[in-house]
A protein has these predicted regions:
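C-terminal outer-membrane/trafficking sorting elements
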Residues: 629-674
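Substrate-binding cleft of carbohydrate-active enzyme catalytic domains
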Residues: 95-131, 135-137
Length: 674
């Protein structure tokens, strides 16, 4: 008996240790990932902005890939792909505290955060100086001997010889990254630091998984080693290459990481008829019938992270047009979201077509499609392409093309979605109700189309809008009927078949028109010697310039708060996603601040004496100087202009005296509207 117990506990310990190792990407995974940023998306990817979207993502998005969250050596806005600090998580997208709050909010909504891990290369102060960082009482620092000996086409070695320092004896294992030091992953010191860093991201910050940047630069064996050390569940590598090379890399990791399915993306792009920001041909949707991708292969589709566009392909500017889709974005997403692999939706697509993409995701999940589902082709013509994917709950047919009416499935399918160049059909075996408008917030009343997906042709739909479960006695409509949603409500719609209600679907709608409001941005330059009395504000957002052209608008309005002089300017927030980017300056070719994201609420900035690349940095002191979020400590205000505005307790400036009851700030005092 004692021997049997020892064997039993040994087996338990062995299984526990096995479970600690990384699995690369879960099998039969039904989740959908969102790339939570695009290039220079400082407006929309602030941690505070993303946190406000968590409730809206719930039930649709399961993973969000965040931009690199570590602090860089630059103090201006940067995307983070030249990392400097590992354990300092204050970035252009927000503070570490805001990041932790975001990840906690995601987790509360069933969403995991994927860290952008950039460890192929690292930035330095000068040529060779890496920061010394202390975490949990241990100091971590890379040295010059952790740099690959042939870094930057051996220009680093030339500089090392001049400076009398040594590099690693090992060459780079892959593609070189110019402008940063390529790290030697064979170095024990490098391995120790990166493992500590990844454990910090996962166990302390709270990330669920990792997206490894530029994995062509170092061996996949290291990714396997790092993932084993952290026991991470989700890992995806950016191996931008031909399909077989991506497969080889996955094998090199011992299948302990997934990879982005670049060739899936190119199949979609080619079918649409675009390349390098040019329309090169008419669409030929039959080109989607390709086996040159990870998604088609039953052995590797578990590790396929499919996508149709990302930050390295989107249109950035006329000088960096890159390789965007340009057209048929909805059809591309419809195809991706109906196929196996784990789809990764691009943030600009999500923002532009959220309602449609939500419905696509809902259909995918209703059918039970996973990253390992099987599919068959139903039609492959120039103007029409159709695939049938078998989920673990039902089957879903996606039809895309310029003539989607060319394919109609049999009577065992019901059409549930239709849009520009795409259609979705769900097998009637699903036996469910369906609504074509997903849960979410809407700015105006709308009509919702209800569909009975049932093998019983006489099935009806019953629904309620008060959140109660529908019964046979509830409001009843025929399949294909439209109902009006004219206020915030919870719609529950069920399938009424042979007197029984089944297949109930729930939709939570918030109907609320956006009300434009005004924020104020304040600037104080007392710390900067000889700044003078001239102050220009230059502001912009994705909609364009919010002030006069550079150097902006000359600001003469000031307020004195507790003896401190503040220049200020009001900005109208016209949509829920709008923000304000701002630079303070003295005029053309004179002193100026770094650029800052002021968000969409009142902000106070002190221009400091510290500089970055010749530009003055600013300290956000809103918490000290803003109209109070509490009721105490209201500052004494002396205006050079009359301020008769009304403010909410969060500092939001209103256009007029509020009609809604509540507590407000008016002329520096708390006022209660009853």
């Amino acid at each position: 008996m004692i021997i049997m117990k020892k064997i039993y506990f040994t087996l338990i310990a062995l299984l526990a240790s096995i479970n600690m190792f990384a699995q690369g990407w879960p099998a039969n995974y039904s989740g959908v990932m969102l790339q939570g940023f695009s290039w220079d998306s400082y407006d929309y990817s602030q941690w505070t902005v993303l946190e406000k979207q968590a409730d809206d993502m719930k039930g649709f998005i399961d993973l969000v890939w965040l931009p690199q969250s570590g602090k860089c050596i630059e103090t201006t806005q940067v995307m983070g792909y030249k990392p400097y600090y590992y354990f300092n998580q204050n970035s252009s997208f927000g503070t570490e505290a805001e990041l932790r709050s975001l990840i906690a909010k995601f987790k509360a909504n069933g969403i995991g955060a994927i860290a952008d891990v950039v460890v192929n290369h690292r930035n330095t102060d000068g040529w060779f100086t890496f920061p010394a960082e202390t975490y949990n009482g241990v100091t971590y620092q890379m040295s010059s001997t952790d740099i690959c000996k042939n870094d930057d086409n051996e220009s680093t070695a030339t500089q090392a010889k001049k400076d009398g320092v040594s590099l690693s004896n090992n060459s780079d294992e892959g593609t070189d990254f110019g402008g940063c030091r390529d790290i030697d992953h064979k170095s024990e010191n490098v391995q120790k630091i990166i493992k500590a860093y990844l454990k910090f991201l996962k166990e302390d910050i709270g990330y669920t998984g990792f997206r490894y940047d530029m994995v062509k630069g170092f061996s996949g064996t290291h990714v396997a080693d790092y993932n084993d050390a952290t026991g991470v569940e989700f890992s995806v590598g950016e191996y931008w290459d031909v399909n077989q090379s991506i497969i080889n890399w996955i094998n090199k990791t011992n299948k302990k990481s997934a990879a982005f399915d670049f060739q899936f993306r190119y199949n979609v792009r080619d079918a649409i008829g675009v390349k390098d920001n040019n329309i090169v041909s008419s669409p030929n949707w039959s080109k989607l019938k390709r086996d040159y991708n990870l998604m088609h292969d039953p052995t590797y589709r578990q590790y396929a992270i499919t996508f149709v566009e990302n930050h390295d392909m989107q249109y950035r500017s006329k000088d960096e047009p890159l390789d965007p889709l340009k057209r048929d974005t909805l059809a591309a997403n419809a195809y991706m979201l109906a196929m196996p692999g784990t789809p990764c939706v691009f943030q600009p697509h999500w923002r532009a077509y959220k309602q449609e993409i939500k419905s696509m995701i809902e259909a995918r999940k209703l059918a039970g499609i996973t990253n390992m589902s099987n599919y068959t082709n139903k039609m492959a013509q120039t103007a029409c392409f159709a695939n049938e994917t078998t989920g673990n709950k039902a089957k879903l047919i996606v039809v895309v093309g310029n003539n989607t009416k060319a394919y109609t499935p049999g009577t065992d399918y019901a059409q549930i979605l239709e849009g520009y160049h795409y259609r979705y059909y769900l097998s009637k075996s699903a036996e469910t109700a369906w609504c074509n408008i997903p849960s979410g917030e809407y700015e105006a009343v709308f009509k919702a189309k209800l569909t009975a997906v049932s093998q019983n042709s006489n099935a009806k739909l019953v629904y309620t809008t008060d959140g109660t479960a529908p019964t046979a006695k509830s409001k009843q409509v025929a399949t294909g009927s439209n109902i009006n949603i004219d206020e915030t409500c919870t719609l529950k719609v069920g399938l009424l078949s042979n007197g029984t209600v089944t297949g109930i679907r729930t939709y939570n709608y918030t109907v609320k028109a956006f009300e434009p409001y005004t924020i104020t941005v304040y600037a104080n330059a007392d710390q900067v010697t000889n700044w003078g009395s001239v102050m220009y504000f230059y502001a912009w957002n994705t909609s364009g310039e919010l002030t006069e052209k550079w150097p902006g608008t000359a600001v003469t309005a000031t307020k004195t708060l507790n003896g401190k002089k503040w220049y200020y300017m009001d900005f109208k927030i016209k949509s829920k996603d709008a923000i304000v980017n701002i630079i303070f300056n003295q005029g053309k070719d004179k002193k100026q601040s770094v650029d800052m994201n002021a968000g969409n609420s009142t902000k106070f900035y002190e221009i400091t004496t510290a500089q970055s690349n010749g530009k003055y940095t600013c300290k956000d002191v809103t918490a000290t100087w803003a109209p109070p979020t509490g009721i105490t400590g209201t500052p004494t205000i002396s205006n050079t202009t009359t301020d008769n505005a009304w403010y909410t307790l969060s500092g939001m400036k209103l256009g007029k005296k509020p009609a809604k009851s509540g507590v407000y700030i008016h002329q520096g005092k708390k006022v209660i509207i009853r």
